[in-house]
Amino acid sequence: MYNTLKPVLQQELADIESAGLYKRERIITSPQGPDITVQGGKNVINFCANNYLGLSSHPKVIAAAKEALDSHGYGLSSVRFICGTQDIHKELEKKIAEFLGTEDTILYAAAFDANGGVFEPLFNEQDAIISDELNHASIIDGVRLCKAQRQRYKHDDMADLEEKLKATESCRHRIIVTDGAFSMDGTIAQLDKICTLAEQYNALVMIDESHCSGFMGKTGRGTHEHHNVMGKIDIITGTLGKALGGASGGFTSGRKEIIDMLRQRSRPYLFSNTLAPSITGASIAVLNMLSETTDLRDKLETNTQYFRKKITEAGFDIKPGIHPIVPVMLYDAKLAQEFAAKMLDEGIYVIGFYYPVVPQGKARIRVQISAAHEMEHLDKAIAAFTKVGKALGVIK
C-alpha cells in the first residue's frame, strides 16, 4: 500500500522544496545559551531560542534538576491519577498558582497538551469559544476537539470581538481566548480591554502565557500583571519550556473548580505520563529564583529596548512593540532563508520564518532577545544584520 502513498509524498515534498518552504534542522552540539556550538564545530551567538531569561543552562537550575533526579528518580512510569503524583508535582502546582495569582494549577507534559485539553471538558454545544484569529496552533487544535460553537475575531480587533460577543449572547457560556503575546509578531494582547468586554458581556477569559510568564509585567507574572488585570483571568495556560527553564512541560492555572474538572476529564492529563521529576524540581527552583528578584526580567527589558532601537536605526522594518520577540520583516520566503544562512556565516544563529508558519508574503527573521545576552552579543548581531542586509539589498 505504501507504493501508492510514496509518490504522492515525494511530489508534495518536491513542491515544498521548490517553493522555498522546506524546513531543515540545524544540529546543536552544546547546551542552550547565548553562545552555542553547531555541528561541525562552529561557534555562534544564538538569537532564536525561547530562552528569554537565560535559565536553560543556569547552574542553579541544573543543580536542582540533578537533586530531583537523585531524590525522586528518572520517571514515574504512570499517569498522575494512578501512581504518578509525587510531592514535588503538588509543590510545583502550588508555586505556579502563587506566582500567577490564581487558585490552583494542573501540570501537563507540554503546553500543547494544556491547550489541547482545556476546552472539551468544560464546554459543549450550548457554549461558544471566541478566539483571536492568530492564536497558537495548540489553541486552534484544542477548539477543534470541542463541540462548542467557534467564533474567530480579527487579530487584536476589539470592535470585532464585541460583535462576536453580541452574536453569541444566547449561548450558555462564552469564553474569550487569546495569546498573551503572539509568537510571530511579539504583539501583546489588549487584555485590559478584553476583560472590560468580558465583564460587559458576561464572558470568561483565557490567555496562553507561553511567551510571557516570567518576564512580562513589573515582577514577571505575565500579561495580566502588565495590564493590571490580575484576578480577572479565569484560565491561564503556559509552558515550562520557554522563559521558565526551557525544558518541557505545560500547565493550566485558574479557578479552583475549573482545575478540578480538568483533573477529572482532560484527556491529555489523564492519558499522558506525568512530568519528569528532574523537570519538576528544576521548575520549582526557577519559580523560587523569579520570586526573589526581578534582575533577569529587568535585564531582558534593557536588552530588548537596546536591540529594537539599534535594529531600527540600521534601517530594518520591524514589528513595533516591547516584547523580546523582534520580527525583522523580509516578506519573501527565499530571501528569509538566504538571509538566515548568511547570518550563520557571520556567526549569528537566526531562523527565517515563512508560510505556513506565517501568512504568505510575510516572511521574516524572528529575533529573540535573552537576559543571557550581553551588549557585546547585541552589537555583533546588529553589525551582522547590517552587513547581510546591505549585501542582499534589504537596506541601503
Give a label for each model feature:
Residues 201-204, 211, 216-322, 335:
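Active-site C-terminal subdomain of aminotransferase-like
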Residues 59, 63-67, 71, 94, ...:
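PLP-dependent enzyme catalytic core of the Aspartate aminotransferase-like
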Residues 51, 151, 155-207:
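Active-site phosphate-binding strand-loop segment of PLP-dependent enzymes
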Residues 101, 125, 145-147, 201, ...:
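Short, structured coil segments at secondary-structure junctions
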Residues 118-137:
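Conserved PLP-anchoring active-site segment centered on the Schiff-base-forming lysine
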Residues 63-111:
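Conserved N-terminal alpha-helix of the aminotransferase class I/II PLP-enzyme fold
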Residues 10-11, 15-72, 203:
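N-terminal "arm"/small-domain region of PLP-dependent enzymes with the aminotransferase-like
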Residues 298-307, 312-347, 357, 362, ...:
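Conserved PLP-binding catalytic core of the aspartate aminotransferase-like
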